[in-house]
């Protein structure tokens, strides 16, 4: 009976998600980034006293974001990527990924960044379905993720298509729980737990798996549907937050079940004529949440927005009046 009820909850959760009230977020500021020549701003986290970013075109560096008057400066910190472990992905996906990385740059395709309280930084590679840990002191190393993670994800219909793999990562402050987002077709949320020094699935690694098309926000006045997608994850106040690229929303989830609890919209601000990009599925790609607000970064691939700006952008939104953990 409990399994039947759990399955019913998974079936109903998209409908419940759609019925939740969505409050607009208030834009506090926007900051173009200089110093990220490849563009493709794809991950964001506050580590220590600074915001850090990654680009999915740069395999060997993080960027420390320094505030400025007219633009923020992205200062590169390089590292050496260790040899890759076996990913467990099928040959066809691996071959296509290698070819694309050679043609466009960014063989790792880094698509997310998170930090724990000890200063460890975690970068997720979409191309190889792997997580790289950069300790504050010591050499980078790939996490030994459990084989069941990939096996369960693919059995649930995720991680089956090229360029639709892991697209976001979040780690709790203790460094004991790590969440990954499968981007699209199907999209989903997965979690692994660190027990002593071993990462493992505690029961199922899959928290949430869903598919299906959705319309973009009404501001775009479009009748064409696109695949639902996750763009990034963040962890704050013992809650998991997802960046919903197509919907132009941030959604709060239960970290143990993946259930959607509440969503907030940034569509009014980002789809104003001057800030709008041509791609209808959205360009928001990086997310950080703290008590004061939300930071969102754009992966626009140097394409211009409505006012002609081509640099990556960092947007700062105020937190909801009742806080991120408030009830609808």
Regions found by a protein language model. Give the residues of each.
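Sequence/structural signature of beta-propeller domains
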Residues: 19-328
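Sec-dependent signal peptide recognition
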Residues: 2-7
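N-terminal signal peptide c-region/cleavage motif recognized by signal peptidases
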Residues: 13-15
């Amino acid at each position: 009976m409990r399994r039947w009820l759990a399955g019913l909850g998974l079936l109903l959760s998209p409908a419940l998600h759609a019925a939740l009230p969505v409050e607009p977020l208030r834009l506090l500021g926007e900051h173009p980034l200089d110093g990220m020549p490849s563009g493709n701003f794809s991950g964001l986290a506050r580590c220590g006293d600074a915001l850090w970013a990654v680009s999915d075109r740069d395999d060997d560096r993080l960027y420390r974001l320094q505030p400025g008057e007219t633009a923020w400066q992205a200062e590169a910190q390089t590292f050496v990527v260790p040899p890759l472990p076996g990913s467990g992905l099928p040959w066809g996906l691996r071959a296509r990924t290698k070819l694309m990385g050679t043609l466009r740059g960014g063989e790792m395709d880094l698509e997310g960044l998170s930090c724990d309280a000890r200063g460890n930084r975690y970068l997720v590679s979409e191309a190889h379905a792997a997580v790289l840990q950069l300790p504050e002191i010591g050499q980078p190393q790939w996490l030994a993720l459990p084989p069941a993670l990939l096996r369960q994800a693919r059995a649930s219909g995720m991680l089956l298509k090229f360029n639709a793999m892991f697209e976001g990562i979040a780690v709790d402050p203790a460094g004991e729980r790590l969440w990954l987002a499968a981007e699209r077709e199907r999209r989903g949320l997965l979690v692994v737990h660190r027990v002593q020094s071993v990462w493992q699935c505690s029961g199922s690694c899959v928290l949430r798996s869903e598919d299906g098309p959705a319309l973009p926000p009404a501001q775009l006045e479009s009748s064409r549907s696109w695949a639902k997608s996750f763009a990034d994850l963040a962890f704050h106040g013992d809650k998991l937050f997802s960046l919903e690229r197509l919907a132009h929303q941030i959604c709060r989830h239960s970290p143990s079940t993946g259930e959607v609890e509440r969503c907030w919209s940034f569509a009014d601000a980002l789809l104003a004529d001057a800030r709008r990009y041509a791609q209808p599925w959205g360009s928001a790609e990086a997310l950080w949440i703290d008590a004061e607000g939300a930071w969102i970064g754009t992966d626009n691939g140097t394409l211009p927005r409505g006012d002609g700006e081509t640099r990556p952008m960092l947007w700062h939104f105020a937190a909801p009046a009742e806080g991120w953990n408030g009830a609808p």
